[in-house]
Curated annotation (Swiss-Prot):
The gene is pheS. NCBIfam families: pheS. Mg(2+) binds at E260. One of its GO terms (biological process) is phenylalanyl-tRNA aminoacylation. The keyword Aminoacyl-tRNA synthetase applies. Its cofactor is Mg(2+). Belongs to the class-II aminoacyl-tRNA synthetase family. Phe-tRNA synthetase alpha subunit type 1 subfamily. Keywords: Aminoacyl-tRNA synthetase, ATP-binding, Cytoplasm, Ligase, Magnesium, Metal-binding, Nucleotide-binding, Protein biosynthesis. It is found in: Cytoplasm. It catalyses: tRNA(Phe) + L-phenylalanine + ATP = L-phenylalanyl-tRNA(Phe) + AMP + diphosphate + H(+). This is Phenylalanine--tRNA ligase alpha subunit. Binds 2 magnesium ions per tetramer. One of its GO terms (cellular component) is cytoplasm.
Length: 350
């Protein structure tokens, strides 16, 4: 009888391998577990049997019934899952949209220049300060040798927020603040160097080379024995680092309220190497900034003793430097957020 049970199991496994559908599986299950199946007949016969294997036959029969039922149930569940997966795959709706390719940002040419200037001067021990957008009339004008009513103020007509506060017309107000701070500092040993970078505002008409708002760099170097030779070295150092070692500078006498002596600084034309072209107006030189030794009166107005300390200074427009460095002909290009224009600087410095 046990051999018969094993034979039924082997036959079931063989038949199940041929089954392809749920209906065929249910039919096979009924034929093996139904009331008239061989297994059912074996179990019925055990009631009147007195064989010694009665218990073993009963256990084997029930185990086979359980095996057949669970195996067919698993088969049916697998067939149903495969059918459902196939149906879902055939009915799948693509709810996605083609993504928009994000543009990689690039450094703005003004930021490139600011970062280069910062590196150039921090390498030789200068501090980097942020200029104030809003400043008092005192530090913007009076402490820089531009008292109330001085005609030179007309060149820097600006917006007054109130009677004592203005939008900064130049970053040189930081020179006044630093000089005043150092004069009050008991620990000041007589030497200090910094550059200040900030936005400035003028009542200028906008055109290809002028803007009512722009960025300015101001340098200040205080020392006990500062001379014009130091100023010339700093100017050459900065210009060669910004525009290349082949660049030369030229100093022309000038007049500024903050400095005495004062000079305008020109650099040799990058395009023609000083030979003369339309860029430099056939002079071979391009004006870039104004500089000089801080006026004794400015030192006194800020609490400094000009007999003990002297200082050099210069001021330059960041936009002016960027336009010369990158060959930009119109200052408006720096403010219009033209992506096509700005992408030109994507790989600068790499």
């Amino acid at each position: 009888m046990l051999k018969k049970i094993n034979k039924i199991k082997d036959q079931f496994i063989s038949d199940l391998n041929k089954v392809k559908t749920i209906e065929e599986a249910e039919k096979l299950k009924k034929s093996l577990l139904g009331k008239e199946s061989e297994l059912s007949e074996i179990l019925k016969s055990l009631k009147d049997s007195d064989t010694n294997d009665k218990q073993a036959i009963g256990i084997a029969s029930h185990e086979l019934r359980t095996f057949i039922a669970s195996t067919i149930d698993e088969f049916v569940a697998r067939i149903k899952k495969e059918a459902l997966d196939a149906k879902l795959a055939s009915e799948k709706i693509d709810v996605s949209l083609t993504g928009t390719l994000a543009r990689f940002g690039t450094k703005h040419p003004l930021n490139i220049v600011v970062e280069e200037i910062t590196q150039i001067f921090t390498e030789i021990g200068f501090d980097v300060l942020n200029g104030n957008d809003v400043e008092s009339d005192e530090y913007c004008f009076q402490k820089l040798n531009l008292p109330v009513g001085h005609p030179a103020r007309d060149m820097q007509d600006t917006f007054y927020i109130d009677e004592e506060t203005v939008l900064s017309t130049h970053c040189t107000h930081m020179t006044a603040r630093v000089l005043t701070q150092m004069a009050k500092d008991e620990n000041f040993e007589g030497n200090y160097a910094c550059v200040a970078i900030g936005n400035v505002y003028r009542r200028d008409d906008d055109d290809a080379t002028h803007s009512h708002q722009f960025m300015q760099l101001d340098l200040l170097c205080i020392g006990k024995k500062i001379t014009f030779a130091n100023l010339k070295w700093v100017l050459k150092y900065m210009c060669k680092r910004l525009f290349g070692e082949e660049v030369n500078i030229r100093l022309r006498p000038s007049l500024f309220p903050f400095t005495e002596p004062s000079v305008e600084v020109d650099v040799s034309c990058f395009k023609c190497s000083g030979k003369g072209c339309s860029i430099c107006k056939y002079s071979g030189w391009i004006e870039i900034l104004g500089s000089g030794i801080i006026n004794e009166q400015v030192m006194l107005l800020n609490g400094m003793d000009p007999e003990k300390n002297t200082a050099l200074a210069f001021g330059a427009g960041i936009e002016r430097i960027a336009m010369l460095k990158f060959g930009i002909s119109n200052i408006r290009n720096l403010y219009e957020n033209n992506v096509q224009f700005l992408e030109q600087f994507k790989f600068y410095g790499e």
